[in-house]
């Protein structure tokens, strides 16, 4: 069976992890990729149901599954990812034609990381509403994720946050690692995020042609 790349999508509660997934999946599907989505919640499968409703007619429900972790979000994706590994392996066996798995963690804090046994690539999502100080607070999600997503840019004027400060601090904390500003209501930055996924995870040769 082919090795299917897996992206872990993590971040604090309410940062927009589910919205990011719901924004990128239709674009990836339109480009011809076959996707699986696995979400984590502590005592429900609400995120999975939300994705199923939002992507109805775009991604069949059977390709979206929720995992009830019953405990700390980071435990289920880092210290003991066995439930998620079982879910991923079951879904990959059911849909062997899959090109990409998107695995959303439960909402956690800036220390969230994923077990390398579970994912190949890490996207960390923060939101502007939490304040422009978040990037300089650092943490593994800020500095070590493969892509940092700074979501909800439209809220900056309402919370007194400076996008320029967040940009400067993200560059300082991440060095050359990519980050992208997004607004899921307008799709601002979503094409850029999809481009990074195609280039760095799916190794799509068409991306370099498009950039030329």
UniProtKB/Swiss-Prot annotation:
Pfam families: cobW (PF02492)
Matching InterPro entries: CobW/HypB/UreG_nucleotide-bd, P-loop_NTPase, UreG
One GO CC term, this protein: cytoplasm
Gene3D superfamilies, per database record: P-loop containing nucleotide triphosphate hydrolases
Keyword terms, alphabetized: Chaperone, Cytoplasm, GTP-binding, Nickel insertion, Nucleotide-binding
Record-level Gene Ontology MF annotations: GTP binding; GTPase activity; nickel cation binding
Localisation: Cytoplasm
GO biological process: urea catabolic process
Oligomer status and interactors: Homodimer. UreD, UreF and UreG form a complex that acts as a GTP-hydrolysis-dependent molecular chaperone, activating the urease apoprotein by helping to assemble the nickel containing metallocenter of UreC. The UreE protein probably delivers the nickel.
General function of this protein: Facilitates the functional incorporation of the urease nickel metallocenter. This process requires GTP hydrolysis, probably effectuated by UreG.
Similarity comment: Belongs to the SIMIBI class G3E GTPase family. UreG subfamily.
Name of the protein: Urease accessory protein UreG 2
Gene name in the database record: ureG2
């Amino acid at each position: 069976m082919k090795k299917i790349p897996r992206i872990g999508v993590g971040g604090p509660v309410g940062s927009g992890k589910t919205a990011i997934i719901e924004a990128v999946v239709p674009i990836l599907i339109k480009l011809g990729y076959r996707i699986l989505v696995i979400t984590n919640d502590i005592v429900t499968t609400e995120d999975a149901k939300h994705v199923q409703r939002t992507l109805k007619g775009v991604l069949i429900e059977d390709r979206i599954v929720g995992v009830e972790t019953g405990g700390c979000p980071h435990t289920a994706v880092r210290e003991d990812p066995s439930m998620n590994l079982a879910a991923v392996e079951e879904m990959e066996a059911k849909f062997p034609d899959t090109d990409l798995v998107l695995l959303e963690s439960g909402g956690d804090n800036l220390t969230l990381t994923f077990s390398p046994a579970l994912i190949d690539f890490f996207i960390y999502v923060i939101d502007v509403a939490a304040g422009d100080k978040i990037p300089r607070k650092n943490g593994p999600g800020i500095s070590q994720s493969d892509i940092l997503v700074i979501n909800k840019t439209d809220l900056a004027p309402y919370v007194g946050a400076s996008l320029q400060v967040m940009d400067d601090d993200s560059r300082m904390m991440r060095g050359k690692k990519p980050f992208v500003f997004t607004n899921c209501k307008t799709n601002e930055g979503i094409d850029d995020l999809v481009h990074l996924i195609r280039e760095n995870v799916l190794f799509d040769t068409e991306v370099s042609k498009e950039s030329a």
